[in-house]
Regions:
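Rhodanese-like catalytic fold shared by cysteine-dependent sulfurtransferases
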Residues: 2-139, 158-161, 167-207, 212-281
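A short acidic-Thr-Gly-centered motif at the start of a beta-strand
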Residues: 147-158
Length: 281
């Protein structure tokens, strides 16, 4: 499996040669990436889950970020491959997380400087009651189908296609789908207001929202559906899922990621790798 994030868990395994010289080591996954699920599931006691997650990650020597909320868990962890897998096996042993699909990727060096485990009101702050992922998913479009639509310039019903980037301007600066509607936002909470001037131009189109791995576009799609937009889909698996399954067709640039690799190209190769990755985490 190449570098990349899943919309659920995204452990990154790394190894080194004897003598400390780094090497790239691909780590295979037994999971079918087409069965990815978002990490949304009800968590009754987020604090207790976070505390155990932290203790087990510390004991295993893992670094990265774990976010726990009443709506689920999301994380990216890096460490020795077996240590990452053991941690994931612990989480999956709990029935509510048993179906989570994990993608493994690799790095020449540890891309995180420390371990951060946080309890949050939401996995990603949006502050919209009508965007609760526990109430159901918004409709999705598979990467291969979106690539076909991009190629033909419309969806399968001949309807005009608009790609809606739900990420912030820093992320967009690294790349986006060609011709996508991008918004001048710095925080995800600004998205609803930033979309208001564009609502008329979206009315007669099939709108596909997208983000890095699927969490933000899920919430954005749910909110816009509740706000009366019934022509909206979300890209299943986000940009990185698209890269993995399709490549870079219709995409210009890289996809920003929230670790020391900075951004990934459509071949899922990092902008920054090796020892530099440790310095920029």
């Amino acid at each position: 499996m190449r570098d990349g994030y899943a919309p659920t868990l995204a452990p990154v395994a790394y190894t080194r040669r004897e003598g400390g010289l780094p090497r790239r080591t691909p780590v295979k996954s037994a999971d079918d990436p087409q069965r990815c699920r978002l990490p949304f599931t009800a968590v009754d006691n987020p604090q207790a889950l976070a505390e155990e997650a932290r203790a087990r990650a510390v004991a295993a020597g893992l670094r990265g970020t774990v976010r726990v909320a009443g709506e689920g868990i999301n994380l990216v962890l890096a460490g020795a491959g077996e240590a990452v897998r053991t941690w994931v096996d612990w989480l999956r042993a709990e029935p509510r997380f048993a179906g989570l699909v994990v993608k493994e990727s690799y790095s020449r060096a540890q891309p995180f400087q420390r371990l951060k485990v946080k309890v949050k009101p939401e996995l990603i702050s949006f502050r919209r009651a009508d965007a609760s992922p526990l109430q159901g998913r918004a409709p999705t479009v598979a990467p291969a189908d979106l690539a076909r639509w991009i190629g033909q310039g419309c969806d399968d019903k001949g309807r005009r296609l608009v790609l809606l980037d739900t990420r912030n301007r820093e992320e967009v600066g690294h790349g986006s789908f060609v011709g996508a509607l991008t918004l001048p936002i710095d925080n995800f909470t600004e998205l609803p207001a930033a979309l208001v001037p564009h609502r008329d131009e979206l009315a007669d189109a099939t709108v596909v929202s997208f983000c890095t791995g699927g969490i933000r576009c899920e919430k954005a799609a749910l909110h816009l559906q509740a706000d009366g937009m019934d022509n909206l889909l979300q890209l299943d698996g986000g940009i990185l899922g698209y890269f993995e399954q399709v490549g870079g067709f219709g995409y210009d640039g890289r996809c920003f990621v929230f670790d020391g690799r900075v951004a990934l190209d459509p071949a899922l190769e990092p902008l920054v790798d090796g020892d530099e990755a440790m310095a920029t985490g």
